[in-house]
Regions:
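Conserved catalytic-core motifs of eukaryotic protein kinase domains, centered on the activation segment
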Residues: 49, 54, 140
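Conserved G/P- and acidic residue-centered "switch" motifs that form tight phosphate/ATP-binding loops
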Residues: 84
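Ser/Thr-centric signal marking residues that sit
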Residues: 35, 47, 81, 108-109
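A short, structure-level motif marking secondary-structure boundaries and short turns
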Residues: 15-17, 50-52, 78-80, 102
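Short, histidine-centered active-site or binding-site loop motifs used for metal coordination
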Residues: 48-51, 133-135
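N-terminal pre-core extensions flanking Radical SAM catalytic domains
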Residues: 1-49
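Radical SAM/AdoMet-radical enzyme domain recognition
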Residues: 60-80, 88-147
């Protein structure tokens, strides 16, 4: 029951219903790793690779075009993740366009961005800040991690 309320809170059930009513497949939800760049080195991170801070991100123009295409397809929600999405200087533009296209917008961040940077993205519908624990908790104790 709680799960239904949470899903309804993000409009996902509504989007799934629309997909079924339209009798065609559309990407109702898109999770987009908008950048591989990150300012942290968390041992458990799936994007912790040697090339993560050297890979090229899509240009602003291409990223905006993808949002336009997702909107044209009927996408209801877009979730920006990464790396650390707040490292993209154009993130507020991407969020603004998605909101203009009536998409719900979610963002996952490590919370290390400046207050000014956070203010530029406050119009997202959901901002999730990863808080993984204290420094002592974060130390691997039962396995060996080799980057």
């Amino acid at each position: 029951m709680l799960q239904s309320k949470l899903i309804n809170g993000f409009g996902i059930l509504k989007a799934i219903g629309q997909v079924k009513l339209l009798n065609k497949r559309i990407p109702a939800y898109c999770e987009w790793e908008i950048t591989h760049y990150c300012n942290m080195s968390c041992a458990w991170c799936a994007t912790l690779t040697p090339e993560r801070n050297t890979a090229d991100d899509l240009s602003s123009e291409k990223a905006l075009d993808i949002i336009e295409q997702l909107s044209d397809l009927g996408t209801q929600m877009i979730h920006f993740s990464g790396g650390e999405p707040m490292l993209r200087k154009d993130l507020h533009l991407l969020i603004t366009l998605a909101k203009q296209k009536n998409m719900m917008v979610a963002l996952t961040t490590n919370g290390s961005a400046s207050s000014e940077a956070m203010e530029r993205v406050l119009h997202a519908d959901m901002i999730r800040v990863s808080i993984d624990g204290t420094e002592r908790y974060m130390e691997p104790t039962s396995f060996s991690f080799q980057p």
